[in-house]
């Protein structure tokens, strides 16, 4: 059990020159932020990446102000819940987000670190295969569970949530470690195959049904 070996991050960045993104203006359409998970040669390649917004296409630098040069360490400031897929498939990159995020935060992450100082919508940390995710807020349904197009939950990695998580969370977990400080919704931890889960708050209905192996710690006696 390796939870104690996971270093919890501080809120201040210690990177020398991280890439910092901030929206230039308020948005009204959803943005697919999965482009941040690409392997860019330098920050100029990132800023020139074409993304869709509404029914048009823009370069990243047209929607976001960008500064810094370390593309392995990214900070997003003033994030909003219209920004989906941040850290999706992330591999060997660290992303820190200040604000709320949309759907599929860290979905199928491979390695690296994701830190969120805000709330996440559904499917956060779904199907992750490695790395560490820290959510210092609440997270929606299917957190740490199956992706919206698959049937496998957490394969490996570490997930920490400071607040509450929603229904159908941490389903079909295969390996990894999870800590939930708050409450957990209905139909959670079902069909667990292995891994370790700590839940400090209350648990919902139909909890840990079909569990085969693994360890769950909870204070809720029901």
Language model region names:
Residues 1-222:
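Long, distal/terminal scaffolding or interaction modules
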């Amino acid at each position: 059990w390796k939870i104690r070996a996971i270093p919890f991050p501080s809120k201040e960045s210690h990177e020398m020159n991280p890439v910092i993104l901030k929206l230039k203006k308020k948005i009204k359409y959803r943005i697919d932020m999965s482009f941040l998970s690409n392997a860019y040669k330098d920050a100029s390649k990132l800023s020139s990446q074409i993304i869709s917004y509404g029914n048009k296409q823009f370069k990243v630098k047209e929607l976001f102000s960008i500064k810094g040069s370390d593309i392995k360490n990214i900070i997003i400031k003033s994030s909003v819940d219209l920004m989906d897929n941040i850290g999706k498939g992330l591999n060997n990159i660290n992303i820190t987000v200040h604000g709320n995020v949309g759907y599929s935060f860290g979905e199928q992450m491979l390695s690296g670190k994701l830190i969120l100082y805000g709330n996440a919508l559904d499917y956060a940390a779904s199907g992750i295969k490695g790395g560490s995710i820290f959510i210092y807020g609440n997270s929606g349904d299917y957190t740490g569970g199956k992706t919206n197009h698959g049937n496998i939950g957490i394969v490996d990695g570490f997930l920490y949530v400071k607040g509450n998580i929603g229904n159908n969370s941490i389903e079909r977990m295969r390996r990894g470690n999870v800590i939930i400080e708050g409450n957990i919704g209905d139909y959670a931890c079902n069909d667990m195959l292995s891994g370790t889960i700590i839940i400090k708050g209350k648990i919902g209905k139909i909890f840990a049904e079909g569990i085969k192996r693994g360890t769950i710690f909870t204070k809720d006696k029901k």
